[in-house]
Amino acid sequence: QVNVYNNGVLVRTMPTSMGMGGTQTVAGQTLTFWTPPGVYTVMDKSNPVVMDSSTYGLPVNSHLGYRETINYATRISPDGIYLHQLDSTVWAQGNTNTSHGCLNLNGDNAKWFFGFSQPGDIVEVRNTGGPPLSLQNNGDWSVPWAQWQAGSAPA
């Protein structure tokens, strides 16, 4: 589930369906269907946005391929992880992970989160079973402070 906090106070709880897990090799490239755990930030928002699996190497006409216009899409990673409306997975939200990596929400919750969140807001994803969020995919906030300091220039 997605718990939304404002200044440390829980303001909304929303069931979600995240990445289904597993991998598939297409044309020599291994694609993963996990939602990486880690600390993301809201990057931008689009309403609507066209999501197309061929943009990351999964042909639209393949078994898991897709090209859909999606409403209330809040992007949290440069490789295309969003919190977004997907009413076709309402049956799974809160109990089964079925997505390619995004966090699916029902229409009311996606619209609310889209309106509530701002670029720069923290989104922490936990307990997905997948590999951790990488730095190149907006994982800067996942780096422990001591490690961050160790990589900085001397004062």
What are these regions (language model features)?
Residues 1, 45, 107:
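Residues immediately flanking
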Residues 1-38:
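Cell wall/extracellular polymer interaction/catalysis modules
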Residues 2, 42, 74:
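Conserved hydrophobic/aromatic pocket- or pore-lining residues that grip, position, or stack substrates
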Residues 6-8, 18-20, 44-46, 87, ...:
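A mature extracytoplasmic/lumenal domain signature
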Residues 16-25, 46-57:
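Short regulatory "switch" loops immediately downstream of catalytic or recognition motifs
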Residues 34-37, 49-155:
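Exported/periplasmic cell-wall-interacting domains
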Residues 38, 42-44:
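A structural signal for short, hydrophobic beta-strand segments that form beta-sheets
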